[in-house]
């Protein structure tokens, strides 16, 4: 039982948003604009969310640089990048609504770079047919967070004038970690957690929760992710009864720093390649031309000369292979290093110095110039960077309704947006789609959470017993006199995931990973943290480990089950895509403490969307049965068009008669 001396701070809200990155802030703004009393829970300091690390830009088909761009082209690019495993409805909504979300952000005060005629500037990025990324130098994520924070402050000022308190309708709880979602039957009733500084417990009673907690990268040693990314939202959703989808798909960004060891994994923005940077191996060869897969061969240049012409004449030349989707580039770099053509630090060279004048590099890529000079003593205006793959993004996440963001499974009142949700990106995310994804689906999740609250006949109640259990679970590591060290456990977990569930996967290694994860589960159950509750990083990690472990098990199980290679999942023993597997989503749920894995059919794309693709392209992804359906659809459409034309001609009467008919009359 909970000690009577255990103090719990209690709050009542309509909507609780867990996560203060782009998705969380946009969801909170929407819930507050809908009139709901909203709490924002930030694991770190407010304004320090991992979104600030997103550098390149936000993808939106505004057509400011190339007027040929539109939502249909963006949709096609997103589906191609995800190898057609995307939830098509999410990809459609994203492509259609991203421009409006970017323009909206500008009305909030965002200061985007401009074209010469004053429009929002857009840059090239891997997998995007046209320049599409709205950007602020190479610090776009930072500007996005600054702008959304500014909007929240303006709402708080409005509340101060109307209600007498800045926190009356929207409040930020920073340096706060949520450890459990609390239920009333199958409905969300609240969230329980603690203040990281004091260790004091906090309880939010609320009928709706929006998860916006980001990714899982801290389960890997080499990662671009910040310390907060321990899979909290994924695990909270699982324990509450929601399902996770596509957890086998992890994106290893092709360009992370590899030297010095203390900064290995820190992101090197794709903007370097978008602005002309090229990849070379230790022999000086521009190697990406050797790695263009058949499914992309029509869109990418075959020679360096054509690739270089594309930057100034994209309408008459094909794209450089350095701008292939990230999964392709990461595998290529991995192969070069594995075959002995890597740099001394175990990466490859990324060269922008020979491609642009020094002043232009400093203007376009100020953060990269500062990062390499400060961390590696490398001047990128004079010498190439050493880069290699780094765990960057999880495509899998909470399975949600595409339109509302409501979680699937056995729980009601739970919503998810951003990286913690799954489906939008399929098997691989295109660069730039993340920031616009945050805005599109953050807005939708926040708005629909507010609608859900409005439609409730009565608010759910938090049971005393569930709070007591949450307290006991949180205190357990502190109450063990002996046990496993949390830092050792994290290192062991990272070794398992990095060595056995990394870029290249094999059946025996995945089976070994699951066996080792089972052993780690027993050890994590005995984790011990010395000291008290006041700012105790060992205790914090001990609690995070439970989340990291269950999410890692989902990834390993799904990776073992999917016997093909697609996007962010590469099986050396099944090296090609299998059209039959494209029709399958792998869905994880919890039965007690056991991860259950089920197969679920991928939703069929609507006719008007699948008709955006050529048959020759679809033949690379679809089964023969699906292609037959497509052919029948095309035939039916042609017949319908012919019938409609005949009907129109008949309705037009004599005016539609040809010259011969007129002569006969």
Predicted feature locations:
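An anion/pyrophosphate-binding glycine-rich loop and adjacent beta-alpha core
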Residues: 242-374, 448-454
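Glycine-rich loop(s) and the adjacent beta-strand/alpha-helix scaffold that form part
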Residues: 208-266, 431-448
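Short beta-strand to alpha-helix junction loop
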Residues: 86-99, 133-150, 173, 223-231, ...
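Conserved redox-cofactor binding core of oxidoreductases
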Residues: 101-200, 212, 256-260, 342-343
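Core beta-strand elements of the Rossmann-like FAD/NAD(P) dinucleotide-binding domain
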Residues: 10-13, 198-208, 410-411
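Short beta-strand "acidic-cap" motif of Rossmann-like dinucleotide-binding folds
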Residues: 36-42, 246
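Conserved N-terminal glycine-rich FAD pyrophosphate-binding loop of Rossmann-like flavoproteins
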Residues: 44-77, 251-254, 262-266
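Glycine- and aromatic-enriched mobile tails/lids
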Residues: 3-6, 10-13, 22, 30, ...
């Amino acid at each position: 039982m909970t000690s009577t001396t255990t103090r719990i701070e209690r709050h009542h809200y309509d909507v609780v948003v867990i996560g203060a990155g782009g998705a969380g802030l946009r969801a909170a703004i929407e819930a507050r604009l809908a009139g709901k009393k909203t709490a924002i829970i930030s694991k770190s300091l407010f304004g320090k969310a991992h979104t600030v690390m997103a550098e390149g830009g936000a993808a939106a088909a505004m057509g400011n640089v190339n007027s040929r761009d539109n939502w249909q082209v963006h949709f096609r690019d997103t589906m191609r990048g995800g190898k057609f495993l995307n939830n098509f409805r999410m990809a459609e909504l994203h492509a259609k609504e991203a421009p409006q979300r970017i323009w909206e952000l500008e009305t909030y005060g965002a200061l985007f770079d401009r074209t010469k005629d004053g429009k929002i500037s857009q840059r090239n990025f891997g997998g995007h047919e046209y320049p599409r990324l709205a950007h602020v130098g190479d610090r776009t994520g930072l500007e996005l967070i600054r702008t959304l924070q500014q909007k929240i402050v303006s709402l708080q000022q409005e509340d101060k004038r109307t209600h007498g308190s800045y926190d009356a309708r929207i409040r930020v709880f920073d340096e706060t970690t949520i450890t459990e979602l609390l239920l009333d039957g199958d409905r969300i009733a609240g969230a329980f957690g603690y203040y990281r500084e004091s260790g004091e417990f906090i309880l939010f009673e609320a009928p709706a929760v929006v998860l916006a907690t980001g990714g899982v990268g801290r389960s890997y040693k080499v990662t671009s992710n910040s310390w907060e990314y321990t899979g909290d939202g994924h695990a909270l959703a699982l324990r509450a009864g929601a399902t996770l989808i596509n957890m086998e798909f992890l994106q290893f960004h092709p360009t992370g720093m590899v030297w010095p060891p203390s900064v290995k994994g820190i992101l090197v923005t794709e903007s370097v390649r978008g602005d002309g940077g090229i990849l070379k191996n230790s022999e000086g060869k521009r190697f990406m031309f050797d790695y263009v897969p058949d499914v992309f061969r029509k869109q990418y240049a075959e020679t360096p000369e054509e690739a270089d012409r594309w930057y100034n004449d994209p309408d008459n030349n094909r794209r450089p292979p350095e701008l292939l989707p990230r999964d392709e580039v990461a595998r290529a770099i991995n192969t070069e290093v594995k075959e002995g053509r890597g740099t001394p630090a175990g990466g490859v060279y990324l060269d922008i110095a020979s491609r642009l004048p020094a002043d232009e590099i400093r203007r376009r890529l100020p953060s990269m110039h500062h990062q390499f000079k400060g961390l590696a003593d490398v001047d990128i205006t004079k010498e190439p960077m050493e880069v290699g793959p780094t765990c960057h993004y999880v495509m899998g996440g909470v399975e949600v309704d595409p339109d509302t963001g409501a979680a699937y499974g056995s729980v009601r009142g739970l919503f998810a947006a951003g990286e913690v949700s799954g489906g939008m990106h399929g098997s691989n995310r295109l660069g730039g789609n993340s920031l616009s994804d945050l805005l599109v689906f953050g807005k939708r999740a926040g708005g629909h959470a507010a609608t859900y609250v409005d439609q409730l006949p009565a608010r759910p109640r938090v049971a005393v017993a569930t709070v007591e259990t949450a307290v006991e679970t949180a205190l357990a590591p502190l109450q063990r006199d002996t046990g496993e060290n949390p830092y050792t456990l994290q290192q062991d977990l990272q070794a398992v995931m990095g060595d056995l569930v990394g870029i290249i996967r094999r059946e025996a290694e995945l089976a070994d990973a699951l066996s080792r994860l089972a052993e780690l589960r027993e050890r994590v159950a005995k984790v011990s943290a010395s000291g008290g509750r006041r700012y105790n990083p060992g205790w914090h990690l001990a609690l995070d480990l439970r989340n990291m472990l269950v999410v890692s098990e989902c990834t390993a199980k799904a990776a073992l089950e999917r016997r093909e290679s697609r996007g962010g999942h590469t099986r050396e023993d099944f090296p090609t895509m299998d059209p039959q597997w494209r029709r399958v989503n792998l869905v994880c749920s919890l039965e007690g403490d056991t991860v259950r894995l089920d197969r679920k059919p991928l939703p069929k794309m609507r006719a008007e969307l699948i008709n955006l693709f050529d048959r020759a392209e679809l033949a690379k992804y679809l089964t023969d049965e699906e292609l037959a359906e497509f052919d029948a659809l095309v035939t039916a459409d042609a017949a319908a068009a012919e019938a409609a034309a005949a009907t129109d001609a008949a309705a037009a009467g004599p005016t539609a008669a040809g010259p011969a008919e007129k002569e006969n009359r």
